[in-house]
Structures are given as C-alpha cells and as structure tokens.
C-alpha cells in the first residue's frame, strides 16, 4: 500500500496534477529542490527531503537524497522482520512510491555550445541511485521514470486501496533499468568520444565505446528464412520520417522481409520532394523494380508498374503523397504485400478494407538523417555515416564534348537519385520521369548494363534517347558501349577510374553526353 511518495523530476510534465491526485488519496509527499517548490507553489503539502532527513543539501545540490533515511525507506523489504525492525530502530518510514527522472544529459550534450563542465554537471547521481534502489525492491516499491505511467499507477491505486499490483511494479522496474542503462550508455558514448583536448567541438563521431539502445516492437514468426528467429527493435533515437515511426492501419503482422523491403521503399520514395510531384517506388528484395514521378499518385504508380510488372508481383509499394481512392483502385488490381504513404484517404482505406491481408503503413514524411548505418560482421559491427549526400546539378561536371540538353539533365538527375537505392553494381535506364530498366547486384558492371537493357526490352519499353546512371565508375568502356547500343544518349557516373580518359573518349566517339558527380553510391 502506498502511504508515502518521493517526487524529484527534471521533466515536470504532469507532475502537479499527479501529486494532487496522490494527495487526494492520502499519500504523504516528499520532494527536492525545484520540484518541491513547484508543488508548494501549487498549494500542495510537501516536505523537503532536507527537512525529512534532517541533513541539508550540500555541494551545490550534488548531495541531497544520498541518505540512509531515503534509501533505507526505499530498499527495506517489507516481508523481512529484521528489515522492518531496523527501520523502526532508526525511525525511518517506508517510501512506497518513487517518481524520478534524470538530469537532461543527452539534451545538454546535443547543444553546439556545450562544454565538458556543462556535460559533467548534468550527470545525475542521486536520481539513478534512487531509481535503481526502487527498481531492485519493486516487490514493495512502485517506481516511475516516465510521466506516461502516471495515469496507470493512479488507476490501480484507486481500484486497489492505494496498492499497485506486482505485474505493474515489475514492468515499471524493467523500464527503470532500461532507462538508467541508456542514460549511462549516453554518458559513456559522449566521454569516450572526446579527443585529447576534451573539447566538445573536437569530439569524434565514433566513440571508443559505443552503446546503442533499442526497444522491441514485436517478435516475428521467423526471420529472413523460416528456420531463423527474429524480432524488430525501434531505435530510441529514431529520427523524423524513419520507417520505425510507422502506424499500421490494417493487414497481417509485418514479417522480417516486409520491414526490410519497406525500409528500402520508404527511403527511396521520400528522397523525392513531394512539393515537386508524386513519386511511387516498387521494391522487390530490397531493390527498386520501378520508380516514377507523376502529376498524381495514379500516374506515378502506372509509370512505375510499367518498368517491370513481373517483378512488381508481391512487392512493396511506397508513395510520397497521400494515396487516394483512384490510385488505390489501380494498386488493388495487383498482389501487393505492403503499401506505404504519408496518409491514406478514406476512399483508399475503403478500397483495401476488402483486402485485409494487405498491410497499410502510414508514416509522416520527414527528412531526419540517422546518425549511423550498421552492418554486422563476424565478431564486430561496421559503423558509418548514412549515404545522405544528394548531388545538385550545379555540382555536376560535363566531361564530354556534347553537353546534355535540359530534358536529358532532368532524366540524369532522376536516374542518379534512383541508382543510389539499387544494389551494386547498379545500372539504371530512365526517361520521362520513370525507370525503364534496372540492372542490380551483378558482380560486373557490364552484366548489370546488359540485364537493365533486357529488362526494358521484356517490358516493351524503348531505350532510345534514355539516360543512364551508374552507381560507380565504368572500369572499362564495355559497359558504356552496352548502354549506348541499347539507345542511351547520356550517362551520369561518379568518375574516378584509372581508365576515365578511355571511357570519356568512348563517350565522345559514340556522340553521347557524360557528366560525373564525384560521389559514389555503392550499396551492399
């Protein structure tokens, strides 16, 4: 039964209302510093911890709750007579509810003007100590670290004569240990990222010790293959626009492969500015098999589907604009696993209501960039910054005698944007705001070029006058000759080969335009 609570919070969201409800339930309130002042100013009866312990705060507030009267009241097991006798001997009442959140260390070190002393002063000591004490003794103590749990605890107290059930206490305790682990991990990440001069501005993006924090969203029936187990975890630092922010509107549970492919689709489609028109991306096995722009979602979808209607079967489809009813009716004619959009109109929702197996994911558009990309290797983790560089037309360098005309330049920029999301080696034919042929994942660039042209031929699409993007340089002229023979009149590629001069000479010989970006987009 909760008779006494200690409240000490940095995030004061909802704390006054929560304390008022506790007071109404007859709970004695203890508090510290700014929290105590806020509660007192709000007319609530509250005792300062310094008055409660008989020992003043000291060292500029560094020591205020590190006292036996606080920790004894939290840690004592109510089922052990010797514990309760010790409390009685030293006149220590039990503390049955602890509400604490920590100094804002992460927010402090995120500021550009942060200094090491600023960071150090925002390392909480008393807060984590109390939290861990209460979480350890969760059989007898309710502990809250998240304001979102205030209502749950109050509801249980009202229903159970001021008591909170063990299952809730256990859940809240595990939440505390996860929170303090993340907090300590953030401190370690920051301090081990500092260089010899210990300056905030000179810190490394890659700390000596890297701690990562993820919350489990769901366990899955299986992983990439049926004999593999799997789960999906959300990064606690998920940025705006990330796939992990999805809301599933309908459909079966997402599988491992669904989520992997959905991420590829969403990252590709949101790279196109919705203000410039609708974009549609169709993904199969993490590769785009159709990408297109249109005046609306329907036009973008129709063009993307034409690129490779065979591979689109059972694919993942993403839009960067709301999916309306007209486009939904067209999409519903094919077998699709997952549909992603910033929003779905009521009409579109109605279309798919009859196809409950189709998973609809709504994700707010956003251009947040993850801090890291990861690749697991045996015994280790490769960590890099994301491939977030988007080359602007002004950065391109024309290396051939012939310059691309405005239409070709538009097609080249579109092709280059798509190639970034195709597995290497990648060759992408484009024209008129749509992909015409995609060659992905081949060990030689010339084979990717051949496959891309064959794909276009199989789809009945002409490559005459098309633009081609290559995610990395042409090591020889053979790949260039394949795309020109297929009908391409302009090429965009990074450049940087030892044989650049030979490849450029071949482009001049064939009469095409070539621009180089100086940026490579390998994707493995």
Swiss-Prot record:
Domain MGS-like as annotated: residue spans: 1-145
Pathway it works in: Purine metabolism; IMP biosynthesis via de novo pathway; 5-formamido-1-(5-phospho-D-ribosyl)imidazole-4-carboxamide from 5-amino-1-(5-phospho-D-ribosyl)imidazole-4-carboxamide (10-formyl THF route): step 1/1; Purine metabolism; IMP biosynthesis via de novo pathway; IMP from 5-formamido-1-(5-phospho-D-ribosyl)imidazole-4-carboxamide: step 1/1
Catalysed reactions, semicolon-separated: (6R)-10-formyltetrahydrofolate + 5-amino-1-(5-phospho-beta-D-ribosyl)imidazole-4-carboxamide = 5-formamido-1-(5-phospho-D-ribosyl)imidazole-4-carboxamide + (6S)-5,6,7,8-tetrahydrofolate; IMP + H2O = 5-formamido-1-(5-phospho-D-ribosyl)imidazole-4-carboxamide
Record has Cell inner membrane as a keyword: no
Leader sequence segment: none
Domain notes: The IMP cyclohydrolase activity resides in the N-terminal region.
Keyword annotations: Hydrolase, Multifunctional enzyme, Purine biosynthesis, Transferase
Alphabetized PANTHER family for the sequence: BIFUNCTIONAL PURINE BIOSYNTHESIS PROTEIN ATIC (PTHR11692:SF0), BIFUNCTIONAL PURINE BIOSYNTHESIS PROTEIN PURH (PTHR11692)
Record's keyword annotation contains Oxidoreductase: no
Coiled coil: none
Natural source organism: Cupriavidus necator (strain ATCC 17699 / DSM 428 / KCTC 22496 / NCIMB 10442 / H16 / Stanier 337)
Protein name: Bifunctional purine biosynthesis protein PurH
Similarity comment text for this entry: Belongs to the PurH family.
GO term, biological process aspect, one: 'de novo' IMP biosynthetic process
Gene Ontology CC annotations of this record: cytosol
GO MF, any single term: phosphoribosylaminoimidazolecarboxamide formyltransferase activity
Gene3D superfamilies cross-referenced by the UniProt entry: 3.40.140.20, Methylglyoxal synthase-like domain
EC number(s) stated in the UniProt entry for this protein: 2.1.2.3, 3.5.4.10
One Pfam family this sequence matches: MGS
């Amino acid at each position: 039964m909760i008779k006494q609570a200690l409240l000490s919070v940095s995030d004061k969201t909802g704390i006054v209302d929560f304390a008022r409800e506790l007071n109404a339930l007859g709970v004695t309130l203890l508090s510290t510093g700014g929290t105590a002042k806020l509660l007192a100013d709000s007319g609530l009866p509250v005792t300062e911890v310094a008055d409660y312990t008989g020992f003043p705060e000291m060292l500029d507030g560094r020591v205020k709750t590190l006292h036996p009267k606080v920790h004894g009241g939290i840690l004592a097991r109510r089922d052990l007579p010797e514990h309760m006798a010790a409390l009685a001997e030293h006149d220590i009442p039990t503390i049955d509810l602890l509400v604490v959140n920590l100094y804002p260390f992460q927010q402090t070190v995120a500021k550009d003007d942060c200094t090491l002393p600023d960071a150090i002063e925002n390392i909480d000591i008393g807060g984590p100590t109390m939290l861990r004490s209460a979480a350890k003794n969760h059989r007898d103590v309710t502990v809250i670290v998240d304001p979102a749990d205030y209502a749950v605890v109050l509801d249980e107290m009202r229903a159970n004569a001021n008591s909170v059930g063990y299952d809730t206490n256990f859940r809240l305790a595990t939440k505390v240990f996860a929170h303090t682990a993340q907090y300590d991990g953030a401190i370690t990440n920051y301090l081990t990222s500092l260089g010899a001069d210990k300056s905030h501005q000179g810190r490394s993006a890659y700390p000596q010790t890297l701690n990562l924090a993820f919350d489990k969203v769901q366990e899955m029936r299986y992983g990439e293959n049926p004999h593999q187990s799997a789960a999906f975890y959300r990064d606690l630092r998920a940025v705006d626009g990330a796939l992990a922010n999805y809301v599933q509107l309908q459909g079966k549970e997402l599988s491992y492969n669904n989520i992997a492919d959905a991420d590829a689709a969403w990252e590709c489609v949101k790279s196109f500015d919705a203000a410039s028109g609708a974009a549609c991306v169709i993904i199969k096995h993490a590769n785009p098999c159709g990408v297109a722009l249109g005046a609306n979602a329907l036009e973008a979808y129709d063009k993307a589907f034409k690129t490779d209607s065979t591979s689109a079967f059972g694919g993942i489809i993403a839009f960067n604009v709301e999916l309306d009813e007209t486009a939904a009716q067209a999409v519903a004619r094919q077998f699709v696993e997952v549909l992603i959009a910033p929003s779905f109109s009521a009409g579109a929702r109605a279309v798919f209501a009859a196809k409950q197996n189709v998973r609809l994911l709504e994700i707010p558009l956003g251009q947040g960039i993850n801090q890291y990309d990861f690749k697991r290797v045996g015994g280790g983790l490769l960590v890099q910054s994301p491939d977030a560089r988007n080359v602007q037309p002004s950065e391109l360098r024309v290396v051939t005698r012939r310059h691309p005309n405005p239409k070709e330049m538009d097609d080249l920029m579109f092709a280059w944007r798509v190639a970034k999301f195709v597995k290497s080696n990648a060759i992408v034919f484009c024209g008129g705001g749509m992909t015409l042929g995609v060659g992905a994942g081949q060990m030689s660039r010339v084979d990717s070029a051949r496959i891309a042209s064959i794909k276009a031929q199989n789809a009945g699409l002409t490559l005459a006058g098309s633009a081609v993007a290559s995610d990395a340089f042409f090591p020889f002229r053979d790949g260039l000759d394949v795309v020109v023979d297929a009908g391409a009149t302009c090429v965009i590629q990074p450049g940087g080969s030892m044989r650049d001069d030979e490849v450029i000479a071949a482009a001049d010989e064939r009469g095409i335009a070539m621009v180089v970006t100086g940026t490579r987009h390998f994707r493995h």
